[in-house]
Amino acid sequence: MIFLWSGFSKDVKYLIQKYIISMVSKNQIKFISSLHLKKNRIANQLFIAEGVKVIQELLKSNFILEHLYCTEPLFDAVQPNLKSIISESDLKKISALTTPNNCLAVFKIPTSMPIFDKGLILALDDIRDPGNLGTILRLCDWFGIAQVICSEQTVDLYNPKVVQATMGSISRVNVSYVNLKSYLQNSALPIFGTFMEGSNVYKENLPKEAIVVMGNEANGISQEIENSIKKRITIPRFGDLQLTESLNVAAATAIILSEFRR
């Protein structure tokens, strides 16, 4: 076997290695799966990203790749020692998704960046749904919002479903977790809050620099944070029956940010 292997050219050896399916050990499966939980992500300073689009975006950014697992040869630019071809059954074992994509990557959690306390800033008060947070970060990327401030109760940025929903925008928006009450009290920027009752956002003369607070999916902005709001704004309803209780927080964020950017 050694003789046969030595008889192959360098290029042929590369192609053989490229297409060999690696076995993922039980310990590897256990470790990668453990990163689905926040406490293990924090302990190991690692998180997972799934899908070609998301992984491509992260590879182009300053995120550092720990290892890449794919069911087919992809990402030729990634060093061979940092990637493995694995079976679909093994991918299902390590994926956080109900229907896994064809690749999963483990990245290092970067060091927190300083807060950019200028321009238009979005503050999130206790957003709990991973899909909502991911979509909101994608919206911030679209509208050029460089800084998002999250309350300490907001869902973890590196939750696999958050990362997936950002579609790579996680690499272009600075997200900081703080004591939101203290942050707002110490900021010199005007603070706007979204409520069911408030000034019609379409009729407001909105500033270029401000903090916009979006509240929890079920309860809105908490009383503690409400006390720091300087201006209450609302998205008016136009339906005749007026039966819809509220907008999804991500949908509301899209409308609000669009108005601030007009």
Q: Which residues does each predicted region cover?
A:
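Boundary-proximal intrinsically disordered activation/regulatory segments immediately upstream
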Residues: 19-72, 155
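Amphipathic alpha-helical repeat scaffolds
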Residues: 51, 128-135, 244-250
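Glycine/small-residue-rich loop that forms an oxyanion/phosphate-binding "nest" at active or ligand-binding sites
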Residues: 84-108
